[in-house]
């Protein structure tokens, strides 16, 4: 991954440490999961994962419980919507939102793109084929070692659950599999009693591009505006 990417990720992680921004997005994911599959984590894998990701960000239990209860109230009237856009330098953007007001959401997104010359929202389906959807799980390397497993053991154990790729990054291990293998991979971790640090469904560009520092700085202004929107829960680009 290029220096511009690392600069962007470092800047984003620093800003996302502001819990006032992170918690509402996590709460929306919990509420929607509970609304779709019920309020019991034991029987709702999507809710279980949303709670796990919230705990990884130190979200208080009271906030988590409140988000689950919200699913049965009028406040829980959320829907998932995906938007696509293009920016300068060949940048492609896919934006995943959870919103109770799609009209507001698309109006806000269009305003962000309009502030960036050369950027625009495009019809849904225009860019989706240029991204692969993947299940991505993270765990700590020392948790694997605590189970007396080598990386080869872990890879072999999870292949039958849909593992496609295993990568070691510093103190973490990243597992990737097909989008449709999310539930199965989750079951694989549970069968090993291996704690999951983070789990998500991601979109990975089939043909990533590299930007220089100046191009990245200009592009990040748009990406920051998008990610700051409370209705946006995930943003993917083709930037390497």
Swiss-Prot record:
Gene3D superfamilies: 1.10.10.200, 3.30.70.980. Keywords: Cytoplasm, DNA-binding, Transcription, Transcription regulation. GO terms for biological process: regulation of DNA-templated transcription. It is found in: Cytoplasm. One of its GO terms (molecular function) is DNA binding. It comes from the Bacteria. Pfam families: TACO1_YebC_N (PF20772), Transcrip_reg (PF01709). Belongs to the TACO1 family. This is Probable transcriptional regulatory protein HPSH_00820. It comes from Helicobacter pylori (strain Shi470). The lineage of its organism: Bacteria, Pseudomonadati, Campylobacterota, Epsilonproteobacteria, Campylobacterales.
